């Protein structure tokens, strides 16, 4: 049972601004998430059904929401971790 990855329109714009090397690193991790998206250690508090992918060396984060009914992973936000920027963006997009 594999999940499909989709992007919110605003998250796709953020994705396209990333360096290709960063995109490739995220793509590799997203592919793994398609098999098992519910990673307990990556679960975000305060945002329902959302998880994060961290790229420690570059400081980038990707926030995704898991929709089990339709087997979809929706990328909600992509950005730097600085001042919790990406997490604030993600929570704003659910309001």
What is each of the regions a protein language model found here?
Residues 1-29:
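Arg/Lys-rich, positively charged N-terminal/basic patches that mediate binding to nucleic acids
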Residues 2-6, 12-13, 55-60, 65-95:
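Enriched for short, Lys/Arg-rich terminal
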Residues 4, 27, 41, 50-52, ...:
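Generic N-terminal leader/processing signal
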Residues 17, 33, 65-66:
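Conserved catalytic core of Hanks-type protein kinase domains
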Residues 20-23, 38, 80:
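Alpha-helix boundary/capping and short turn/kink residues
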Residues 31-55:
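A short, surface-exposed loop/turn module that caps and links secondary-structure elements
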């Amino acid at each position: 049972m594999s999940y499909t990855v989709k992007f919110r329109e605003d998250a796709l714009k953020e994705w396209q601004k990333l360096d290709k090397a960063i995109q490739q690193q995220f793509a590799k991790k997203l592919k793994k998430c398609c098999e098992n998206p519910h990673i307990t250690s990556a679960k975000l508090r305060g945002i329902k059904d959302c998880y994060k992918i961290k790229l420690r060396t570059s400081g980038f984060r990707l926030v995704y929401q898991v929709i089990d009914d339709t087997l979809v992973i929706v990328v909600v936000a992509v950005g730097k971790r600085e001042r919790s920027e990406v997490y604030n963006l993600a929570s704003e997009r659910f309001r």
